[in-house]
Amino acid sequence: MHFRAITRIVGLLVILFSGTMIIPGLVALIYRDGAGRAFTQTFFVALAIGSMLWWPNRKEKGELKSREGFLIVVLFWTVLGSVGALPFIFSESPNLTITDAFFESFSGLTTTGATTLVGLDSLPHAILFYRQMLQWFGGMGIIVLAVAILPILGVGGMQLYRAEMPGPLKDNKMRPRIAETAKTLWLIYVLLTVACALALWFAGMDAFDAIGHSFATIAIGGFSTHDASIGYFDSPTINTIIAIFLLISGCNYGLHFSLLSGRSLKVYWRDPEFRMFIGVQFTLVVICTLVLWFHNVYSSALMTINQAFFQVVSMATTAGFTTDSIARWPLFLPVLLLCSAFIGGCAGSTGGGLKVIRILLLFKQGNRELKRLVHPNAVYSIKLGNRALPERILEAVWGFFSAYALVFIVSMLAIIATGVDDFSAFASVVATLNNLGPGLGVVADNFTSMNPVAKWILIANMLFGRLEVFTLLVLFTPTFWRE
């Protein structure tokens, strides 16, 4: 294990991250909200930490194997999540405990969108902007992680598209491929953000809110600059714009990449995962619309469709924006939408959850087992598009599902053990492990009332969800650390 080479990379990441503190610092200057000092302090502290890690190891550029890759990916999220908590700790408004500061930072960076803050409307603009920016940078990291890095390590939903896994990865060989892909993906990400911000601005948001909400939308994060979330704007047009951009961001960025490379729009419909993703969203919208209409929750049919469309897409893509307290909907719907977050977005998107591709393959495997019961001697292969998938891929899906279920059950029991009621414990684990954000019960709006121990368990859940479980779990195996 090349610890010095890893330390060099982590140090460099922290130095780069310290530079991002300048942006909310400028926002504090523009709005004169007095929050600038927290970002100035964080800038110097992060720069010092990064330099101490990078400078002694700056010449270490040894060969990086996939083992080092796992450690770098986990350290990326844990170190930046910890450094990201500093502005909340240094800030006078909001006055957060260390636990709450870490919770807020990790929730932003993993694009979970769960919050411990109340009274957002009265907070300094710089702090509000920083929360949105954390999600945007988190989403940026996720895209590169999901499409360019995890497949090389043999983990993650995108691995299902690429059965071949390369052997030892030399630092210099790995860099151009990842850097090249990352540049194009980031270009798509930035273009979508600009388009979303402009659309929201034209729809009536002011520039600050439009930029902030475009950050959280494209990252499928769910943080808002208002306590009432998107409901603050009370605009069906804004609801529709956000829902459309959430659907675009919930797609596999590899498909957007293909479109940018000159392929036709048919590339989307040819993808079985995309078809299932749209099918799930459509089915949920129809169910929600009918139930809301039947219970006369809204006064008009158009309002019912708009609210159902927005809330379904927001929850099913794991963004977690709200327009209305869905707790006042018939109980069946909030529970259905919470469960839809288990499916989440497509592989290679900023969405959370198990990912559509895995659910699709689990269905296909279930179907194959039913056929085998009828024809025990027949040989059935599982295809994705026109390509038969090797058994190793299918074993990986079951392995992931088992690990996910294990983390889910252990987390839920641990939270119940801290004194939280069972329904809220279930909802909070669903909300954090799937990177959804809001839950039900005591965590329907925020996580303020959760006890500190439960909050740390939920922070770990956010990381497990974001790093596709295995990436983090592999670090706890003795084999990983053996030379």
Swiss-Prot record:
Annotated membrane topology: Multi-pass membrane protein
UniProt KW keywords: Cell inner membrane, Cell membrane, Ion channel, Ion transport, Membrane, Metal-binding, Potassium, Potassium transport, Transmembrane, Transmembrane helix, Transport
Binding positions (K(+)): 111-112, 220-221, 318-319, 435-436
Presence of the UniProt keyword Iron in the record: no
Region (Selectivity filter part 2): 219-224
Similarity remark: Belongs to the TrkH potassium transport family.
Record-given protein name: Trk system potassium uptake protein TrkH
